[in-house]
Amino acid sequence: MKLTCVLIAAVLLLAVCQLDSADATGYMRKNPSLRSPKRTRGCKSKGSFCWNGIECCGGNCFFACVY
């Protein structure tokens, strides 16, 4: 029972993270100035702990920056 609850919580967390990063990607697509290489100054590198995909240079977050 505990394992089932943990798996459900993990899947829900992953879904929220994916929806959040998808929204950020759409926003960057609408505003071309955000896609410039200069924007990487304030972002976190691959392997850094994150809460949101916007924090990562690659835009993908799953507890740590993926790219």
Curated annotation (Swiss-Prot):
<keyword id="KW-1015">Disulfide bond</keyword>
<keyword id="KW-0960">Knottin</keyword>
<comment type="similarity">
    <text>Belongs to the conotoxin O1 superfamily.</text>
</comment>
<keyword id="KW-0800">Toxin</keyword>
<keyword id="KW-0732">Signal</keyword>
<feature type="disulfide bond">
    <location>
        <begin position="50"/>
        <end position="61"/>
    </location>
</feature>
<keyword id="KW-0528">Neurotoxin</keyword>
<feature type="disulfide bond">
    <location>
        <begin position="43"/>
        <end position="57"/>
    </location>
</feature>
<dbReference type="InterPro" id="IPR004214">
    <property type="entry name" value="Conotoxin"/>
</dbReference>
<feature type="signal peptide">
    <location>
        <begin position="1"/>
        <end position="24"/>
    </location>
</feature>
<dbReference type="GO" id="GO:0008200">
    <property type="term" value="F:ion channel inhibitor activity"/>
</dbReference>
<dbReference type="Pfam" id="PF02950">
    <property type="entry name" value="Conotoxin"/>
</dbReference>
<dbReference type="GO" id="GO:0090729">
    <property type="term" value="F:toxin activity"/>
</dbReference>
<dbReference type="GO" id="GO:0005576">
    <property type="term" value="C:extracellular region"/>
</dbReference>
<keyword id="KW-0964">Secreted</keyword>
<feature type="disulfide bond">
    <location>
        <begin position="56"/>
        <end position="65"/>
    </location>
</feature>
<protein>
    <recommendedName>
        <fullName>Conotoxin Cl6.6b</fullName>
    </recommendedName>
</protein>
<feature type="propeptide">
    <location>
        <begin position="25"/>
        <end position="37"/>
    </location>
</feature>
